[in-house]
From Swiss-Prot:
Job of this protein: NDH-1 shuttles electrons from an unknown electron donor, via FMN and iron-sulfur (Fe-S) centers, to quinones in the respiratory and/or the photosynthetic chain. The immediate electron acceptor for the enzyme in this species is believed to be plastoquinone. Couples the redox reaction to proton translocation, and thus conserves the redox energy in a proton gradient. Cyanobacterial NDH-1 also plays a role in inorganic carbon-concentration.
Protein name per the record: NAD(P)H-quinone oxidoreductase subunit M
Key words of the record: Membrane, NAD, NADP, Plastoquinone, Quinone, Thylakoid, Translocase, Transport
Cellular component, GO annotation: plasma membrane-derived thylakoid membrane
Family matches, as InterPro entries: NdhM
UniProt subunit comment: NDH-1 can be composed of about 15 different subunits; different subcomplexes with different compositions have been identified which probably have different functions.
Family statement drawn from the similarity comment of this UniProt entry: Belongs to the complex I NdhM subunit family.
Superkingdom of the organism of origin: Bacteria
Subcellular location: Cellular thylakoid membrane
Keyword presence, Translocase: yes
Any Pfam family hit: NdhM
Species of origin: Prochlorococcus marinus (strain MIT 9301)
One example GO MF annotation: oxidoreductase activity, acting on NAD(P)H, quinone or similar compound as acceptor
């Protein structure tokens, strides 16, 4: 029986047991693809993207040899969400004012008026 593509979806993180081939997701049992901030809610800089990628790669290495089931994918997604919130709270990431919907899903931005 052929395995199905698994995915874990949070508001800002989507993880698939797949690789991108010709701009399409193709199931791959040994690869994960990260779709970060699909709604463009944040403004990303190179440093914050590198931190996310390092964390993602580290979480994958921690799970080497384990089955990547729905539960493990959700745990990875939750940890990435936590890092996004940390980066936002520490000013290393900011909301995108041109986002389709401005809902401050990770809390209100820290400004001098709020502090």
């Amino acid at each position: 029986m052929e395995k199905m593509l698994l995915k874990s979806t949070t508001r800002h993180v989507r993880i698939f047991t797949a690789e991108v081939v010709d701009e399409e997701l193709k199931f791959h049992p040994n690869k994960l693809t990260l779709d970060l901030d699909p709604d463009n809610e944040f403004i990303w800089n190179e440093d914050s993207l590198n931190k996310i990628n390092e964390k993602f790669n580290g979480l994958i290495k921690e799970r080497a040899g384990k089955d990547l089931d729905d539960y493990e994918l959700r745990k990875i997604g939750s940890e990435i969400e936590g890092l996004i919130k940390f980066l936002l709270q520490n000013g290393q990431l900011s909301y995108n004012p041109d986002c389709r919907v401005m809902n401050y899903s990770m809390g209100l931005p820290m400004t001098n008026e709020v502090l």
